[in-house]
């Protein structure tokens, strides 16, 4: 049976380039999705063993079929990527870690998942076992809470006005679909930005539903505590707020000195670096990839090499 692939992995060539020198040990794909990145890496690294995680049951089910030829080298696990480091074995043997923290094309295009502005549902949960969906947020959050979401996560200047419109409409009838919400928010653009106001608002709601920024910070903090040895980490993000967080952590990890900037002379020992930043600038999709997959336009990848001396 030929499987119809529901998602194109972004920055596939660039991911393979980052991990090209891996030989043995374990590779952790924290956000397996539909297996595109892992499939390519499994083919090119025959001596690597894989731990593949995702919180989406549908994605895991599909990927188990897609990667069945590699079943002797791969362990599957359902988990949010912020929790996966606490659950896995072979931590000391990790040589590569990949986290692609975007929404898959399958999730965006699946009407029942409620991610798209054209959806008849209002859900947006990446983990369908989660209790809070977009429906609860839109219909129960206070005007102040909604304003905060649109301002902080969507960076929308008229966040208060959008929240006010939502509260007014739901006082008449509960908002039950993404289509309805789209009509309420409107189609306009946010000043000079190319992305529509509705897209930014939907993105903000999705971040709140899935606690995406908190999850990312938790994951990076767990890595910081773990201090992997001789391990490459690559993170693909699709939102400027996420990319900013990754950039800040990588910068922090690369520093030897952790003294207060106001101190004239180092007092910390100047030996706190966990490794080196591999990517001086975030890697973006090539022109060729953009032509094939327009959804890769927001993707940015940063990579870090852990070689901390304390763990040697």
From Swiss-Prot:
One of its GO terms (cellular component) is cytoplasm. The keyword Methyltransferase applies. It catalyses: cytidine(1402) in 16S rRNA + S-adenosyl-L-methionine = N(4)-methylcytidine(1402) in 16S rRNA + S-adenosyl-L-homocysteine + H(+). Its main location: cytoplasm. One of its GO terms (biological process) is rRNA base methylation. Its EC number is 2.1.1.199. S-adenosyl-L-methionine binds at residues 35-37, 54, 81, 100, 107. Pfam families: Methyltransf_5 (PF01795). GO terms for molecular function: rRNA (cytosine-N4-)-methyltransferase activity. It is found in: Cytoplasm. It is an enzyme of class 2 (transferase). InterPro entries: RsmH, SAM-dep_MeTrfase_MraW_recog, SAM-dependent_MTases_sf. Keywords: Cytoplasm, Methyltransferase, rRNA processing, S-adenosyl-L-methionine, Transferase. PANTHER family: 12S RRNA N4-METHYLCYTIDINE METHYLTRANSFERASE, S-ADENOSYL-METHYLTRANSFERASE MRAW. This is Ribosomal RNA small subunit methyltransferase H. It comes from Campylobacter jejuni subsp. jejuni serotype O:2 (strain ATCC 700819 / NCTC 11168). The gene is rsmH.
């Amino acid at each position: 049976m030929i499987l119809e692939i529901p998602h194109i992995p972004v920055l596939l060539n660039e991911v393979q380039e980052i991990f090209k020198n891996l030989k043995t040990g374990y590779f952790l794909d924290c956000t397996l999705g539909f297996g595109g990145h892992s499939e390519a890496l499994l083919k090119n690294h025959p001596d690597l063993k894989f731990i593949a995680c995702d919180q989406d049951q549908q994605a895991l089910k599909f990927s188990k079929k897609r990667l069945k030829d590699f079943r002797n080298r791969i362990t599957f696990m359902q988990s949010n990527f912020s929790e996966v480091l606490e659950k896995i074995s072979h931590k000391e043997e990790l040589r590569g870690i990949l986290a692609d923290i975007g929404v898959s094309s399958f999730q965006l295009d699946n009407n029942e998942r409620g991610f798209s502005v054209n959806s008849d549902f209002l859900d947006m949960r990446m983990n369908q076992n989660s209790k809070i969906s977009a429906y609860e947020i839109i219909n129960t959050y206070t005007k102040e809470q909604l304003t905060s979401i649109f301002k902080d996560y969507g960076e929308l200047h008229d966040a208060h006005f959008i929240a006010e419109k939502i509260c007014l409409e739901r006082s008449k009838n509960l908002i039950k679909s993404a289509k309805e919400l789209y009509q309420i928010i409107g189609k306009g653009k946010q000043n000079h930005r190319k992305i529509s106001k509705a897209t930014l608002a939907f993105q903000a709601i999705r971040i709140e539903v899935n606690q995406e920024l908190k999850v990312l910070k938790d994951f990076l903090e767990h890595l910081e505590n773990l201090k992997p040895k001789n391990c490459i980490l690559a993170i693909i993000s699709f939102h400027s707020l996420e990319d900013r967080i990754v950039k800040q952590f990588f910068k922090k990890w690369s520093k030897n000195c952790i003294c207060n900037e106001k101190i004239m002379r180092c007092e910390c020992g100047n030996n706190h670096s966990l490794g080196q930043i591999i990517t001086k600038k975030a890697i973006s999709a090539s022109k060729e990839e953009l032509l094939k997959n327009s959804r890769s336009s927001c993707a940015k990848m940063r990579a870090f090499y852990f070689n901390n001396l304390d763990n040697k």
